[in-house]
Amino acid sequence: MMRRIAVAIVAATAAVQAAAPPDLDGWVARSMQTFNVPGLALAIVKDDAVVAAKGYGVRKLGETTPVDENTLFGIASNTKAFTATALGLLVEEHKLEWDAPVVRYLPAFAMWDPFVTRELTVRDLLVHRSGLGLGAGDLLWWPASTYNRKEIAQRLRYIQPATSFRSAYAYDNVLYLVAGEVIETVSGQTWEDFVSTRILARVGMTGSNVRHSAAAAGGNVAAPHAPIDGKVRPIAPFDSDNTNPAGGINSSARDMAKWLRVQLSGGVLPDGSRLFSAATARELMTIVTPIPVNDPPPELAPLKPNFNGYALGFGIRDYRGHKLALHTGGLPGYVSRVVLVPELKLGVAVLTNQESGAAFDSIAFRIVDHYLDVKPFDWIDGFRKVQERSDAAARDAERRASAQRDTASKPSLPLAKYAGTYRDAWYGDIVIDLANSAERGKLVMKFSHSPSLVGDLEHWQHDTFIARWRDRELRADAYVAFALNPDGSIDQVKMSAVSPATDFSFDFQDLLLKPIAANSTKH
């Protein structure tokens, strides 16, 4: 009898320890209200049990259809762990090696530096230490472009590095596209087919899919939202599939709970079979690229780490004495967070249909704190203060730029002299036209491979204009600065984002545009 009582007490204690925070629903509601999030999906796994897999809010503002456990959200860069896992499966099958050069599998692959071309490995594709700058090359696919995956990979040889090889961390997306090409070449399947059949199907993620374009197909899908001119509203989904290996998966709370379980179990599936080996599990969560440790804002003091780095598709850091494997994901209208605490067998996934990292982190860290049994911290208030300060800093930067503007200055040349075709070595051609009289003789900039990058050039000062993109959902207006030769002809054009809040994937600053002759071959 006493033994049965003891067992019952242990079981009851374990159940209490595994239970979600008692204030979870209220906390989520407060976070969503504070950060203007219409809909959210949440998955919590503890000790190989699904504690929560549920939806909150609505799929689309202005409609009443609720988010449920099966509602799909774009998980964006949380896809990277799937791509890394796919490569791990091929390593286990002896079809490739982590530390073999990429050119062994893709002989035509090349980077700017021949040394890097020769030495860059499969592992290097995943860990953000190639020497490319932050978001380098993203304009090849963001916003949606006409380049296909192979063409994007081929253009990497024209992107100059920002640092020396393996010397610094700088987040990129384009090398995950190359990883997708490696998977296709080695396996004989497209990245999409490989991940669908070899990972999603085996894990039981039957509701998920692997294409950006699928999110636009309708069904039980959360609509993307973003603040446009100060008001959150639905926006058009990102529907280009050329970057699926870096961020193309759409998933739900129900399916993400299954993914968390597999990762926390070191690759073991619920039926006892393995998706991947213990060796692959160690590879996925072992730091390769160190990341400098910086103090967080004072409002978020508990986030201070002792170590930080990037593994294979996961960031790795410590939090309150425990190792975390985590990642974020961001697309137009969707952001997400995955957090794994392997020592606690705890996993959290937060998927949202609004671009508020403050929302997903205020929820994720509240849940982690609960299972660590530490004093509650008001993450919502902390992230709110940091976000407000960041927003204010961005506005102040734009005000300072406006105050320093020389409003009396005029362009050095007649507007027609700025018109023409300009070429960047890695992006290709950009055309500047003098618009017709109906548009009052304004210059219009058009990116040849990015249909939505069409902008009216407003004179700013001297020979600098601002490209006001006609698609206002981009939120990425850019300075366009013309440099002249002594004879008054145009030597080159440089660009940069107007607002410091512009997404880093609009890597305008990496473009070096040179005028080309009218009879040059189009790029």
Name the predicted role of every residue range.
Residues I9, I44, F109, R129, ...:
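Residues that line or immediately flank small-molecule/substrate-binding pockets and catalytic motifs
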Residues V58-N173, G180, S187-Q189, T197, ...:
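Active-site-proximal loop and beta-strand segments within enzyme catalytic domains
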Residues T121, L175, S252-D255:
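An acidic site on a long C-lobe helix of protein kinase domains
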Residues V37, S130-L134, Q160-P161, G204-S208, ...:
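Generic structural signal for secondary-structure transition and capping sites
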Residues A19-K54, W141, E184-T197, A201, ...:
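Catalytic loop of the DD-peptidase/beta-lactamase superfamily, centered on the K-T-G motif
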